[in-house]
Regions:
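Beta-sandwich strand segments
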Residues: 14-21, 69, 73, 90-97, ...
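Short beta-strand elements
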Residues: 127, 132, 161-163, 297-320
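A short tyrosine-centered beta-strand micro-motif
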Residues: 175, 278-289, 369
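Boundary/junction segments of secreted and surface-exposed precursor proteins
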Residues: 4-110, 114, 316-323
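Sequence contexts marking disulfide-bonded cysteines in secreted/extracellular proteins
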Residues: 12-14, 30-34, 40-42, 67-73, ...
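Exoplasmic/lumenal beta-rich domain surfaces
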Residues: 172-173, 181-277, 290
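Short amphipathic, basic-aromatic surface patches that mediate peripheral association
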Residues: 64, 81-166, 176-185, 294
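Proline- and Ser/Thr-rich low-complexity, intrinsically disordered segments
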Residues: 319-369
Length: 369
């Protein structure tokens, strides 16, 4: 009997040691393209956000009342959520703080700067002491016959998080609490009740899709309660491509093919703010990964998911709730002018002092509304 390690088995489909964009090697010999029979193709990632992890990880989601005390102090009016982002694609999601030439790139206002810093050890500050943002470099690998090659492109920004001690990709996931609307299939178009931060992640290989901890998170469909579970290496054309060891390095981070990153609800920023006056009842938690489409993937249409969730610790159902009112302009009217007033909180029904039952009303007279 001959024992072959996984790393040996993947030896002819690897990105390890690939530092030259157009080099000659045999590192892609056994890599498979998405289309059968092709020998020249991008090996792109396909990152999703897992509805099963959003629904069950760490026994969440966890809802807190508007006034929280004791063990939940500091979570007033929060709905804590977990984000898991599996990569079910043919190649790794690889983002880098250092490009192929050893340069790091920064944005200072409207200006772009670069420094040669191959190990990412130098400190850079904008000349005007303004906000410093480092540009993310995405490396996209390509199979050209037996050769593994790559291109690089800018893909958004990242920020150093002192509380975590490493860089996070900016705007990696967003979470919102929404009301489902009949005849609108896309949850991203549903009315927003509450939002959270645009959360940045340090991207790493946290769980394998084949592990007990990651089982069920990786599926071939992003829709709630749908999709075949991908928990076998044979279900991925290039399982492990990327190295299965990405971490929070300032030089290179990512998610290998067949792996996922997980940010638990216990971490900083992993919550949705529930507005005061929100009624108990049925809602949806909507999550989206890479909402700005900064990263190049094989499928850009499966980057969101939505799960049902029932609020139980807010205002009693059908109690009327409360609503902040916002206007589309300065609420001072001259003769012939109009202003649009909108209820800030999304709801199923509305009742204005004018008798109107729409979320927004247009008024042309001063008064209390």
């Amino acid at each position: 009997m001959v024992t072959v390690s996984l790393s040996d088995a993947l030896g002819q489909c690897t990105v390890s040691g690939i530092t030259t964009p157009n080099g000659t090697n045999t590192s892609a010999t056994s890599c498979l393209c998405e289309t059968a029979g092709q020998t020249d193709c991008d090996l792109r990632p396909d990152v999703m956000i897992a509805w099963s992890a959003l629904q069950t990880y760490a026994s969440g989601p966890s809802e807190y009342p508007q006034v929280c005390s004791g063990g939940c102090s500091g979570n007033d009016g929060r709905l804590r959520v977990t984000g898991a982002t599996p990569n079910i694609g043919n190649g790794p999601l690889n983002f880098r703080g250092v490009d192929k030439d050893g340069k790091r790139w920064f944005i200072c206002g409207t200006d772009t700067f670069s420094i040669v810093d191959p190990n990412s050890t130098q400190t850079f500050s904008c000349p005007n002491s303004g906000l410093t943002k480092q540009l993310v470099v995405q490396r996209v690998y390509r199979k050209v016959g037996n050769n593994m090659r790559f291109t690089e492109r800018f893909a958004g920004t990242m920020t150093y998080h002192p509380s975590h001690g490493h860089n996070h990709v900016d705007d990696w996931v967003t979470f919102s609490l929404r009301l489902a609307i009949a005849n609108e299939p896309n949850p991203l178009n549903w009315p927003i009740v509450g939002t959270g931060a645009k959360v940045g992640f340090c991207l790493m290989d946290y769980f394998s899709c084949t592990s007990a901890s990651g089982n069920g998170h990786c599926r071939n469909d992003h829709i709630y309660n749908q999709g075949t579970v991908l928990n076998q290496q044979s279900q991925f054309q290039n399982f492990g491509l990327g190295g299965q060891a990405y971490n929070c390095s300032p030089v290179s981070q990512g998610i290998s093919a067949g792996w996922e990153d997980v940010y638990s609800e216990s971490l900083d920023g992993m919550w949705i703010n529930i507005p005061p006056g929100t009624c108990n009842g049925s809602y949806y938690i909507v999550a989206q990964v890479d909402p700005l489409n900064n990263f190049l993937e094989s499928n850009e249409n499966n980057n969101w998911t939505a799960i049902p969730f029932t609020l139980t610790q807010q205002a009693p159902a059908n109690s009327g709730g409360t609503c902040g009112i916002i206007s589309d302009r300065e609420p001072v009217l001259c003769s012939g002018e109009q202003v649009v007033l909108t209820c800030q909180n999304a709801g199923y029904t509305y009742l204005w002092s004018t008798g109107a039952t729409t979320r927004s009303i247009t008024v042309d007279q001063g008064g209390n509304y």
